[in-house]
UniProtKB/Swiss-Prot annotation:
PANTHER family: ASPARTYL PROTEASE AED1, ASPARTYL PROTEASES. Keywords: Apoplast, Aspartyl protease, Disulfide bond, Hydrolase, Protease, Secreted, Signal. Residues 132-460 form the Peptidase A1 domain. It comes from Arabidopsis thaliana (Mouse-ear cress). One of its GO terms (cellular component) is apoplast. This is Aspartyl protease AED1. The keyword tRNA-binding does not apply. The active site is at residues 150, 345. Induction: Up-regulated locally and systematically during systemic acquired resistance (SAR) and locally by salicylic acid. The local induction is independent of EDS1 while the systemic induction is EDS1-dependent.
């Protein structure tokens, strides 16, 4: 009898254990990941109407700024108007074309790209689709301004009063240097003026014409930048633009995070060791991300890949060595991405892949999604699905392998572009031009770390 009771007790314990294990498995399934696929709520693909929820990760370090998507629930620049996907795609393609144009010219000098101080007084096309913004205080007293941050640009600039040429419309009042006690124009004799090659009354004048015909022109200056109340930077070089054109959606200017000497990370090397990181929230979410300077708060789970010797002084290069869709590795050879490799860019929205690589990714994705109703393409995107009447959808995971044995699995929000419930598209595009570009949709929710001094870029999941 004693043996029987012990046996029954063991059976009961085993059942309890199995029940607990299955419950744990269900929890993991509910959280999104199931082996080689994600199951998500269809409603989560579309913008949330709930109020903004700030990310707690942005407040863990003093040198951290809140990042919002320009069209997201947390943006003070957004309106109730419907997101214009056609415009986003058009601007994104303009940015991509400007990147390839700069590469073909092999121009490493952003500031002197426009040699003349005579710029066309006409409406330029937007500076691409840089759609993530931060707010920084400039001057004394500080003037809070919303800036698009961009890893493909070096010089930080903002519109300034007076507008001697023309200025586009922005949400906040323009920065007025005469109202700041810490503003200083940079003299023509300054080493920082060497690249500008233009002067006005002994003051250094900068001119930047972007490849998409947007431009900014004004004085190269130094000013106090306030990141947070406890993190203030003195004598930061920036552009005080008095002649600016482009459709910048209400932002005051641009925060340059590129690899050049005038970028904010390069200027603050002694403070932050030329390290910065960010997490980009999906535009459909009601949460914020972060842009953090320095190594404080970087997760130990970050996996790094070397910054490649890509022949460009204005972008960060990375080497893609593999892509998987679900349980299938794409047949990528060492020559699939040519000698140019790839770049990672915070301002390009959608990832561009070599045409043959994209064709294989699309083929495998279609195979994994064969149980769903396909529909017509949209703009750049030729692989779309109709999810009408569905509560959930299961996507195959998509993972990128980078040099250094670094594997980055994309978040569910980094796979598709939801135009409407009857048209949800694979958010990748093929491109005959090189290099490949790893865009910001595919970077969403990842912690992306740029250790520029260490020559590496890192990734970790659940960054915001």
């Amino acid at each position: 009898m004693s043996i029987m009771r012990n046996f029954l007790s063991m059976i009961i314990m085993l059942c309890v254990c199995l029940n607990w294990c299955f419950a744990e498995g269900a929890e993991k399934s509910d959280s999104g990941k199931v082996l080689d696929s994600y199951t998500i709520q269809v409603s989560s693909l579309f913008p949330s109407s709930s109020s903004c929820v700030p990310s707690s990760k942005a407040s863990n370090t003093k040198s951290s700024l809140r990042v919002v998507h320009m069209h997201g629930a947390c943006s003070h620049l957004s309106s109730d108007a419907r997101v214009d996907h056609d415009e986003i795609i058009r601007r994104d393609q303009a940015r991509v074309e400007s990147i390839y144009s700069k590469l073909s010219k092999n121009s490493a000098n952003e500031v002197s790209e426009a040699k003349s101080t005579e710029l066309p007084a006409k409406s330029g096309i937007t500076l691409g689709s840089g759609n993530y913004i931060v707010t920084i205080g400039i001057g004394t007293p500080k003037h809070d301004l919303s800036l698009v941050f961009d890893t493909g640009s070096d010089l930080t600039w903002t519109q300034c009063e007076p507008c001697l040429g023309s200025c586009y419309s922005q949400k906040e009042p323009k920065f007025n240097p005469s109202s700041s006690s810490t503003y200083q124009n940079v003299s023509c004799s300054s080493p920082m003026c060497e690249d500008a090659e233009s002067c006005s009354a002994s003051n250094c004048v900068y001119s930047i014409v972007y490849g998409d015909k947007s431009f900014t022109q004004g004085f190269l200056a130094k000013e106090k930048f306030t990141l947070t109340n406890s993190d203030v930077l003195e004598d930061v070089y920036f552009g005080c633009g008095e002649n600016n054109q482009g459709l910048f959606d209400g932002v005051a200017g641009l925060l340059g995070l590129g690899p050049g000497k005038l970028s904010l990370p390069a200027q603050t090397t002694t403070t932050y060791n030329n390290i910065f990181s960010y997490c980009l929230p999906s535009f459909t979410s009601n949460s914020t991300g972060h842009l953090t300077f320095g190594s404080a708060g970087i997760s130990e789970s970050v996996k790094f890949t070397p910054i490649s010797s890509f022949p460009s002084a204005f972008n960060y290069g990375i080497d893609i060595i593999g892509i998987s869709v679900g349980d299938k590795e794409l047949a990528i050879t060492p020559n699939s991405f040519s000698t140019e490799g790839a770049i990672i860019d915070s301002g390009t929205v959608f990832t561009r892949l070599p045409t043959k690589v994209y064709a294989e990714l699309r083929s495998v994705f279609k195979e994994k999604m064969s149980s769903y109703k396909s529909t017509s393409g949209y703009g750049l995107f030729d692989t779309c699905y109709d999810f009408t009447g569905l509560d959930t959808v299961t996507y195959p995971t998509i993972a990128f392998s980078f040099a250094g044995s670094t594997v980055v699995e994309l978040d569910g929000s980094g796979i598709s572009l939801p135009i409407k419930i009857s048209q949800v598209c694979l958010a990748f595009a093929g491109n005959d031009d090189l290099p490949a570009i790893f865009g910001n949709v595919q970077q969403t929710t990842l912690d992306v770390v740029y250790d520029v001094a260490g020559g590496r870029v890192g990734f970790a999941p659940n960054g915001c």
